[in-house]
């Protein structure tokens, strides 16, 4: 079993218009590479996909949760019917807070609805809770030694082994694609102090149950409640973030917080107002067809008319490859679908690097109005990048690589015409 590596986010304080927003933390994630029967995302380029070939930046071996295509094997599939096993657990020193089904209801059906909207109906997420009461662990929570940043060994292995022993008489683990462990929120510290929520994905060294390893398992602990009164609407969002790791997506925040991507992807910020995934991630997960992606790989001028990412159908993404491991993605973001906090719609431009580890900044959003302070004061939304999208008449320039991306105009239907020049 390879040494566990973890990605930790520091607290980030964000101002609210009416009240002080409390410090927020995101979850950690761990990937333990190994063989698995299924992989997520689009398949490798076929001959008929030749025009897209240069834009399929390659998955980089040895990189945790590489942004490359196709997604490495070992993760849960991200299209079609996905069965999610949910087990609500408590401990002798932390008995269940409320009923177990009330804990389940904190996340569902909201999580399933979030994936339905984000995937344009391509992911059918089916949450199941075959055990409707609290699943009591045989040891106190303190005995497992779980803290933020804890490796899989020995604490989580021991916890998973106890979960399997306790649940196996009533659960057929082989029937499920992923596992969510919904811990009673009074086990461990408040999320305002430190977030324990974590995902172990691609971990074929995990304990087996009913002939399968619990290789893609998310753990959710205390409630991500910032005191703004929005928990009932937004508190569930930690689970789509954690399940994003199960599908092979990396953490986009860094040790400095969400300053590289902001609120433009739930893998960057999962506190506060609802937000969606980047178009690159939707292509990676198989939620966009190849026909919805344009590839500006050749020298010269390329023009694309892009429809809002929130809308089903139509051209969604233009990509400008810089190397076999990096390039610029171009998409249209509006306040619709899962994107609740968009205060300045427009064309979002960001750099994707497949040779950068999760939590080290594999994606960087280009800010059209640097040091502006942004256009939002919503709690737990990275303000500076909230006005990052480019508007008609504005141009992004990368002189070192000879790239100019200009937003030409927006039509009455909200489609944006984008011109990309390569020299």
Predicted segments, located by residue:
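Secretory targeting and sorting signals
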Residues: 2-36
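Sequence contexts marking disulfide-bonded cysteines in secreted/extracellular proteins
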Residues: 52-60, 294-296, 374-376
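N-terminal beta-strand/alpha-helix entry module and adjacent surface
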Residues: 21, 54, 234
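Intrinsically disordered, low-complexity acidic/polar segments
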Residues: 95-96, 190, 276, 339, ...
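Short, polar loop/linker segments at the starts of domains and inter-domain junctions
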Residues: 97-109, 277, 342-344, 363-366
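Non-catalytic C-terminal accessory/binding modules of secreted extracellular proteins
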Residues: 3, 57, 65, 208-223, ...
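Extracellular hydrolytic enzyme modules, especially secreted metalloproteases
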Residues: 173, 178-180, 186-341
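Zn2+-dependent metallopeptidase catalytic core
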Residues: 34-35, 41-231, 240, 395-396, ...
């Amino acid at each position: 079993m390879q040494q566990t590596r973890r990605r930790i986010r520091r607290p980030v304080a964000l101002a609210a218009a009416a009240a002080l927003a409390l410090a927020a933390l995101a979850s950690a994630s761990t990937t333990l590479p190994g063989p698995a029967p299924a992989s997520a995302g689009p398949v490798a380029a076929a001959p008929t996909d030749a025009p897209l070939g240069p834009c399929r930046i390659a998955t980089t071996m040895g990189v945790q949760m590489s942004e490359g295509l196709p997604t490495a094997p070992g993760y849960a599939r991200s299209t079609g019917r996905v069965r999610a096993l949910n087990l609500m657990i408590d401990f002798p020193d932390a008995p269940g807070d409320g009923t177990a089904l009330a804990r389940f209801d904190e996340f569902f059906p909201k999580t399933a609805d979030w994936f339905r909207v984000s995937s344009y109906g391509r992911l059918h997420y089916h949450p199941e809770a075959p055990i409707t009461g609290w699943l009591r662990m045989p040891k106190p929570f303190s005995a497992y030694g779980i803290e933020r940043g804890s490796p899989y060994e020995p604490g989580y292995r021991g916890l998973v082994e106890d979960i399997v022993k306790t649940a196996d008489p009533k659960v057929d683990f082989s029937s499920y694609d992923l596992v969510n462990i919904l811990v009673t929120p009074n086990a461990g510290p408040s999320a305002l102090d430190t977030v324990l929520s974590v995902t172990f994905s691609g971990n074929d060294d995990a304990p087996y149950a009913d002939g399968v390893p619990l290789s893609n398992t998310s753990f959710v602990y205390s409630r991500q409640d910032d005191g703004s009164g929005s928990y009932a609407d937004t508190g569930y969002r930690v689970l789509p973030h954690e399940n994003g790791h199960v599908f092979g997506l990396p953490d986009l925040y860094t040790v400095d917080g969400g300053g590289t991507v902001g609120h433009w992807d739930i893998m960057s910020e999962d506190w506060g107002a609802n937000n969606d995934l980047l178009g690159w991630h939707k292509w990676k997960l198989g939620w966009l067809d190849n026909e919805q992606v344009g590839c500006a790989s050749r020298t010269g001028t390329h023009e694309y008319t892009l429809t809002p990412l929130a809308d089903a159908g139509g051209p969604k993404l233009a990509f400008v490859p810089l190397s076999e491991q990096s390039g610029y993605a171009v998409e249209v973001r509006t306040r619709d679908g899962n994107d609740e906090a968009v205060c300045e719609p427009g064309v979002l431009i960001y750099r994707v690097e497949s040779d950068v580890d999760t939590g080290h900044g594999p994606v960087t959003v280009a800010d059209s109005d640097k040091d502006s302070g942004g256009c939002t004061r919503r709690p737990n939304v990275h303000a500076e990048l909230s006005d990052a999208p480019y508007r008609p008449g504005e141009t992004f320039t990368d002189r070192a690589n000879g790239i100019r991306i200009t937003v030409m105009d927006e039509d009455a239907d909200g489609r944006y015409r984008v011109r990309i020049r390569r020299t």
